[in-house]
């Protein structure tokens, strides 16, 4: 008799949880909710404490504090109970003596700083002594001869910040902390991807990303409601598709956006994930800003002798806001290819934050050379629909100076997993094939079926007994015909109706099957050798079961006949409404209750990763390019700007704002955690996978596409995301 299967130790766990409670095994599978995930991380940290000879049960540890931070907004009862339990422990238990919190995957916890080596403190003391002496000299000089002092009063103040910062690590979790001045606030520049194999085929993927970000002062300190009305285009007949008319709110803030696959993964990582994983889901996101440096620019002399002088400004500030409650309009920067970019070794800039403002639009629909008056107007602001948001009134703003840092804390995603395999089974491939009566006598011969009049099967054709592969009814409709190149008009003007991305079939019907057209710059994959133009490509979805070959679609009359004449069939050669270039497939929609179709695939590197759910009672089933739609709030938009750096000429009543020319740099670092499942092997034949070919082969996958030239020029073109096939039915 076989021994009984061993079960993981459960300990005391409330109903609906796997890790929230004492005495659990660390191998209970996937956590049930964010509070349970925090409990799992807490248990893993306790396990590391115990292995290092410490007793975390009798002392309050950093792991306890992190659990408190992660469950502060918990909605479930277990998370709330655990949160207040450890807050009570913090009030009464002594603090665990530890230099650093143990990790569970061999990497430091995001938002924490490793303790500086001893020589740092020696250098700090020397620097403090030097700065104090310099400040005293400057004060003496100022009192004796009235010479202007630069940063003199700030020197001792900066040294005091150094001493405070040296006492312990910087703060984290949704706020800024004193970094201690120039040369003290340090961090790690990490763009690695870690794979932690959890058992049962599950993999935890942790992608780190770091960028150096350059930030200029805003063009204006004001919010501006600006209007675009390109009447030179739209005032001409037939130019409706050139319409750019709109109003937007321009803000003095910038958006730090990492919502693109290329920000997080290098091409070889994406190759590994796509070739080996069957599905993937988002888990958590952490972000931090550190090593803030703010400089002022002054110009000496004039004319040909003019030179610019750059100085560190230790009193200027950078403002940081995190819209964690999604109050502000949601504006993914990848829509315009304005993320942090795909090259970790290249400095980048944030995207100017702006959003649409309500404005009615009226534009005549015309054709080329049509005579008559064209209506081309824009309305005024509506009291009913106007929404003007300011960051200063809706967000808590942190002020960072040179050397300071900021951490967002951990955001946990609530999304559905997506598949990383494609399916080839169309309607014609569902179910049981027809029966073969005679097998081929040679490798080049065809098989023989039962005569049509003697076949059994199911059809939905009345008055005819033909059972063929074309007339048989399958259990569902895979994919569907959808109207394409359809422009509808709302209050804001005409817009192209989005089409579900599907494969393009043999007919290369890109428009009919929703192929996506990307236009992008050098930070997002364009050849760095290009001059004053953009790179473009068309993304055709790898979903071989969902596309339609519209040129070969047809509709037959009733009653059905197997040999229709011209009056009994509608084909793509029959024009619609007398328009010789428009056919019924342009407007035909076959979507219905029996329709099944795949989710849009992730698009590497230019595609969006996650999106916000529309706040409407009836939600779309999917979004055009983002495979993950957050069920609750999406990750908060991270906004930055330089605070006004004014001169002594400032006049609040003047339209001219006298500012010191200021710019800054900082390092952004993110940690994106995903959960994936390894793809099991099933077929006898080898499967297709992403693989590079030799240089100079003129092949799409030629390795030279991802290699730099002698002068550093490089490109980053899209890779397949669903190379391996699977069964649907």
Curated annotation (Swiss-Prot):
Q: Where is this gene product found?
A: Virion; Host nucleus
What biological-process terms (Gene Ontology) are attached?
clathrin-dependent endocytosis of virus by host cell; microtubule-dependent intracellular transport of viral material towards nucleus; symbiont entry into host cell via permeabilization of host membrane; viral penetration into host nucleus; virion attachment to host cell
- Write out the GO MF terms: metal ion binding; structural molecule activity
What main location does UniProt list?
A: virion
Per the Swiss-Prot or TrEMBL record, what residue ranges does the short sequence motif Nuclear localization signal cover?
A: 4-13
The Polar residues compositionally biased stretches are 24-35, 97-108, 134-157
Keyword list, A-Z: Capsid protein, Clathrin-mediated endocytosis of virus by host, Cytoplasmic inwards viral transport, Host nucleus, Host-virus interaction, Magnesium, Metal-binding, Microtubular inwards viral transport, T=1 icosahedral capsid protein, Viral attachment to host cell, Viral penetration into host cytoplasm, Viral penetration into host nucleus, Viral penetration via permeabilization of host membrane, Virion, Virus endocytosis by host, Virus entry into host cell
InterPro entries the UniProt entry points to: Capsid/spike_ssDNA_virus, Parvovirus_coat, Phospholipase_A2-like, VP1/VP2
- The segments labelled Phospholipase A2-like in the record are 19-64
Q: Where is the composition biased (Gly residues)?
A: 168-184
Protein residues bound to Mg(2+): 325
| Chain intervals with Basic residues compositional bias | 1-10
Recorded domain comment: The N-terminus of VP1 is sequestered within the mature capsid. It contains a phospholipase A2-like region and putative nuclear localization signals.
- Write down what this protein is called: Capsid protein VP1
Origin species: Parvovirus LuIII
């Amino acid at each position: 008799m076989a021994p009984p299967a061993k079960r993981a130790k459960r300990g005391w766990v409330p109903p609906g949880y796997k890790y929230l409670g004492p005495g659990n095994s660390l191998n209970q599978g996937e956590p049930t909710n964010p509070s349970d995930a925090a409990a799992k991380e807490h248990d893993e940290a306790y396990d590391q404490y115990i292995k290092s000879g410490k007793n975390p049960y009798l002392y309050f540890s950093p792991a306890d504090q992190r659990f408190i931070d992660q469950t502060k907004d918990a909605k479930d009862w277990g998370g709330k109970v655990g949160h207040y339990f450890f807050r009570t422990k913090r009030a009464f238990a002594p603090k665990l003596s530890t230099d650093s919190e143990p990790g569970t995957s061999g990497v430091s916890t995001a938002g924490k700083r490793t303790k500086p080596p001893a020589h740092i403190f020696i250098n700090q003391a020397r620097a403090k002594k030097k700065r104090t002496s310099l400040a005293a000299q400057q004060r003496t000089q100022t009192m004796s001869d009235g010479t202007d002092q630069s940063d003199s009063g700030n020197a001792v103040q900066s040294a005091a910040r150094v001493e405070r910062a040296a006492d312990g690590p910087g703060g984290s979790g949704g706020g800024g902390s004193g970094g201690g001045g120039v040369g003290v606030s340090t961090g790690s520049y990490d763009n690695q991807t870690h794979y932690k194999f959890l058992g049962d085929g599950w993999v935890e993927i942790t992608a780190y990303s770091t960028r150096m970000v350059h930030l200029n002062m805003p063009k204006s300190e004001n919010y501006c409601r600006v209007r675009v009305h390109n009447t030179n285009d739209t005032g001409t007949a037939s130019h409706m598709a050139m319409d750019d008319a709109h109003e937007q709110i321009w803000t003095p803030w910038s958006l730090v956006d990492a919502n693109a696959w290329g920000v997080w993964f290098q091409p070889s990582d994406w190759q590994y994930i796509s070739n080996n994983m069957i599905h993937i889901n988002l888990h958590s996101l952490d972000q931090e800003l550190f090593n803030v440096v703010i400089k002022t620019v002054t110009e000496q002399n004039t004319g040909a002798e003019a030179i610019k002088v750059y100085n560190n400004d230790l009193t200027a500030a950078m403002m940081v806001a995190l819209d964690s409650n999604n109050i502000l309009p949601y504006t993914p920067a990848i829509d315009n290819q304005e993320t942090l970019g795909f090259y970790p070794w290249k400095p980048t800039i944030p995207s100017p934050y702006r959003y649409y403002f309500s404005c009615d639009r009226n534009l005549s629909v015309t054709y080329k050379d049509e005579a008559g008056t064209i209506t081309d107007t824009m309305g005024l602001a509506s009291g009913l629909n106007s929404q003007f948001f300011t960051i200063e009134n809706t967000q808590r703003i942190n002020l960072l100076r040179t050397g300071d840092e900021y951490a967002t804390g951990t955001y946990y995603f609530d999304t559905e997993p997506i598949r990383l395999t494609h399916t080839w089974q169309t309607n014609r491939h569902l179910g049981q094939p027809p029966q073969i009566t005679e097998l081929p006598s040679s490798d080049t011969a065809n098989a023989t079926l039962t005569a049509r009049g003697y076949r059994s099967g199911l059809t939905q054709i009345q008055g005819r007994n033909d059972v063929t592969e074309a007339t048989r009814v399958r259990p569902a409709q895979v994919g569907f015909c959808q109207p394409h190149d359809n422009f509808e008009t709302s209050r804001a003007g005409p817009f192209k109706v989005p089409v579900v991305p599907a494969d393009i079939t043999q007919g290369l019907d890109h428009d009919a099957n929703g192929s996506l057209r990307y236009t992008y710059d050098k930070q997002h994959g364009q050849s760095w050798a290009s001059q004053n133009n953009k790179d473009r490509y068309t993304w055709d979805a790898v979903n071989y079961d969902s596309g339609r070959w519209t040129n070969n679609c047809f509709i037959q009359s009733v009653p059905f006949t197997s040999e229709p004449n011209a009056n009994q069939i509608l084909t793509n050669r029959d024009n619609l409404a007398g328009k010789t270039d428009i056919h019924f497939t342009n407007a035909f929609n076959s979507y219905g209750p029996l329709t099944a179709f795949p989710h849009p695939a992730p698009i590497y590197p230019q595609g969006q990763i996650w999106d916000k759910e529309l706040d409407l009672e009836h939600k779309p089933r999917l979004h055009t390019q983002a495979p993950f739609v957050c069920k609750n709030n999406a990750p908060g938009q991270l906004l930055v700007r330089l605070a006004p750096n004014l001169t002594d000429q400032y006049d609040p009543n003047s339209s001219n704002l006298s500012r010191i020319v200021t710019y800054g740099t900082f390092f952004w670092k993110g940690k994106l955690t995903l959960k994936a499942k390894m793809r099991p092997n099933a077929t006898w034949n080898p499967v297709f996978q992403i693989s590079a070919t030799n240089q100079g082969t003129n092949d799409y996958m030629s390795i030279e596409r991802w290699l730099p030239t002698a002068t550093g020029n490089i490109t980053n073109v899209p890779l397949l995301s669903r190379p391996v096939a699977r069964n649907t039915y």
